[in-house]
């Protein structure tokens, strides 16, 4: 994976809502800013029950968005990442509809999981209570197979039916996705919800040894096709470290809440500790199409005796701080307040979660860009977007608070804002300075500040992050300072917004 900043976006939420329009915006408005792009699901349909993450046909581009030819055209200028939704597919898919009609006589019957296929001898209360699920309740819903009511496994929503990845039909389906991606000039595949993709009686059915075998198998198939694999798993931080040794790339989901914690408390020790132990083969993010995963810095959800990167009371306080910073907007979009019950996420844009404080926001981005890994910026974050309460009220889907539709005119207007200009400059700096391909080190000054340094053959750069200097959402004091050396000499910026860095 190229060591350059990437964008995460939906195909339909930048410009006129097509892949061609998105491509034009990337090539013009963000030229030199984003080298690669993760296009969130654009399959048929892209606007289903979970915004494309419940595909009816995972191998077809929704014709309302464009075609595979449009994807291939984009690949001429940008490396492309695409999702492979490993755990489930839409109940409206031809395969599941065939099972509904024919029951066990359907050729696709083995492809889908029922309670009895995982628990052929029945399940005890302990078995069922031990299943980990990111939603309340048990992971089953009623469907009729040829008139007979069955309990179908659904890890997420009733419309997203789980695939039996052990079955021949299930595996053939997943490989058909890999084949299509390889044929369409895709460079990277993100394995969505893979942590739930291997079911086994008597286990939590989440990130078990069987899951790691599935991940290894998928990775092998990716290598055969020239596809680099990225794993998407929200879990206890030690599991993230363990996963990283088994895959090409893993998300650093602990970073977003850790930086929110540092900026609200002034304490950098948790960030320093994470810097010391985190995997370097990471994709770093502050925001994604999902909420902010506070679970990733707390204690293990399956064993509370395993402590997190911060105490659980700090996690609770952080959630309350985000709600306060957003004036209750995130609270209206999180948990039982909205239709999608996310037990481990707070729904808000990252900019709003910081109380729309420009200095805090650019400092968080700077730390993200300085930590080892490939940085990705979500399209709403790329424009320092605020919570979309109008869309939330329209859909009552909590995550939609962070899924705004930007017209081209709106994009152009936001590009004039100083904080967005500063972010674009910072991304270009990250892409152009060769020090970021060199060696990394960090130092701390007690619990007050942390400095990150990169040294290359012809350049070097040091970012100092000192959140205590600007505590409070209304405090406009800069909390990040940057020093760098390039071919033109030594440079320094004490305010990344007023004086953004430029590589000579």
UniProtKB/Swiss-Prot annotation:
Q: Give the first-level EC class, as a single word.
A: transferase
Q: Which residues form the active site?
A: 192, 232
Q: Which InterPro entries match?
A: Glyco_hydro_13_cat_dom, Glycoside_hydrolase_SF, O16G_dom_2, Suc_Porlyase_C, Sucrose_GGa_phosphorylase-rel, Sucrose_phospho
Per its UniProt record, what SMART domains does this chain match?
A: Aamy
Q: Name one Pfam family in it.
A: Alpha-amylase
Q: What is its EC number?
A: 2.4.1.7
Residues bound to sucrose: 88, 190-192, 232, 289-290, 342-345, 399
TM ranges are none
One Gene Ontology molecular-function label: sucrose phosphorylase activity
Please state how the activity of this protein depends on pH: Optimum pH is 6.0-6.5 for the phosphorolysis of sucrose.
Q: Which CDD domains match?
A: AmyAc_Sucrose_phosphorylase
The lineage's top-level taxon is Bacteria
Q: Which GO terms describe its biological process?
A: carbohydrate metabolic process
Question: Which keywords fit this entry according to its UniProt record?
Answer: Carbohydrate metabolism, Glycosyltransferase, Transferase
Temperature sensitivity?
Optimum temperature is 48 degrees Celsius for the phosphorolysis of sucrose. The His-tagged enzyme shows an optimum temperature of 58 degrees Celsius. The immobilization of the enzyme on Sepabeads EC-HFA increases thermostability, and optimum temperature is shifted to 65 degrees Celsius.
Where is substrate annotated to bind?
50
Recorded family membership? Belongs to the glycosyl hydrolase 13 family. Sucrose phosphorylase subfamily.
Q: Which PANTHER family match?
A: SUCROSE PHOSPHORYLASE (PTHR38784:SF1)
* Assembly and binders: Homodimer.
Function description: Catalyzes the reversible phosphorolysis of sucrose into alpha-D-glucose 1-phosphate (Glc1P) and D-fructose. Is involved in sucrose degradation. Also displays transglucosylation activity in vitro, by transferring the glucosyl moiety of Glc1P to a broad range of monomeric sugars, such as D- and L-arabinose, D- and L-arabitol, and xylitol.
What is the protein name for this chain? Answer: Sucrose phosphorylase
Natural source organism: Bifidobacterium adolescentis (strain ATCC 15703 / DSM 20083 / NCTC 11814 / E194a)
The root-end lineage is: Bacteria, Bacillati, Actinomycetota, Actinomycetes, Bifidobacteriales
UniProt lists the gene as: sucP
């Amino acid at each position: 994976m190229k060591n350059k900043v990437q964008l995460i976006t939906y195909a339909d939420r930048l410009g006129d809502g097509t892949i061609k329009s998105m491509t034009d915006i990337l090539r013009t408005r963000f030229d030199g800013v984003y080298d690669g792009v993760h296009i969130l699901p654009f399959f048929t349909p892209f606007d289903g029950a979970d915004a494309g993450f419940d595909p009816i046909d995972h191998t077809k581009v929704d014709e309302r968005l464009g075609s595979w030819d449009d994807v291939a055209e984009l690949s001429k200028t940008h490396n492309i990442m695409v999702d492979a939704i490993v755990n489930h597919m839409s109940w409206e898919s031809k395969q599941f509809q065939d099972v509904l009609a024919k029951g066990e006589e359907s050729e696709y019957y083995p492809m889908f999981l029922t309670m009895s296929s995982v628990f052929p001898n029945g399940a005890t209360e302990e078995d069922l209570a031990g299943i980990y699920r990111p939603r309340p309740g048990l992971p089953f819903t009623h469907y009729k197979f040829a008139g007979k009511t069955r309990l179908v496994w659904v890890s997420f929503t009733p419309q997203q039916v789980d695939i039996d990845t052990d079955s021949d039909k299930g595996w053939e389906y997943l490989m058909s996705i890999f084949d299509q991606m390889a044929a369409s000039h895709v460079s990277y595949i993100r394995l969505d919800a893979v942590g739930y993709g291997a079911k086994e009686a008597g286990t939590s059915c989440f990130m078990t040894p069987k899951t790691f075998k599935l991940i290894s198998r998928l990775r092998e198939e990716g290598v055969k096709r020239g596809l680099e694999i990225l794993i998407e798993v929200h879990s206890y931080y030690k599991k993230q470290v363990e996963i990283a040794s088994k895959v090409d790339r893993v998300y650093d989901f602990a970073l977003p809440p850790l930086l929110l914690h540092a900026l609200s408390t002034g304490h950098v020790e948790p960030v320093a500790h994470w810097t010391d132990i985190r995997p370097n083969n990471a994709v770093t993010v502050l925001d994604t199409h999902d909420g902010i995963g506070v679970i990733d810095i707390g204690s293990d959800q399956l064993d509370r005796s395993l402590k997190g990167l911060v105490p659980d009371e700090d996690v609770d306080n952080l959630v309350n701080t985000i709600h306060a910073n957003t004036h209750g907007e995130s609270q209206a979009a999180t948990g039982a307040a909205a239709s999608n019950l996310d037990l481990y996420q707070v729904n808000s844009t990252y900019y709003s979660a910081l109380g729309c404080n420009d200095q805090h926001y650019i400092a968080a981005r700077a730390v993200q860009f300085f930590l080892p890994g490939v940085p990705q910026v979500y399209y709403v974050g790329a424009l320092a977007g605020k919570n979309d309460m109008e869309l939330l009220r329209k859909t009552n889907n909590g995550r939609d608070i962070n899924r705004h539709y930007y017209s081209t005119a709106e994009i152009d207007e936001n590009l004039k804002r100083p904080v967005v200009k500063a972010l674009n400059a910072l991304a270009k700096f990250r892409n152009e300075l060769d020090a970021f391909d060199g060696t990394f080190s960090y130092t701390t000054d007690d619990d007050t500040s942390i400095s990150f340094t990169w040294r290359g053959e012809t350049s070097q750069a040091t970012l100092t992050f000192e959140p205590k200097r600007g505590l409070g959402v209304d405090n406009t004091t800069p909390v990040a300072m940057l020093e760098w050396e390039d071919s033109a000499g030594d440079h320094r910026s004490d305010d990344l917004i007023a004086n953004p860095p430029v590589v000579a």
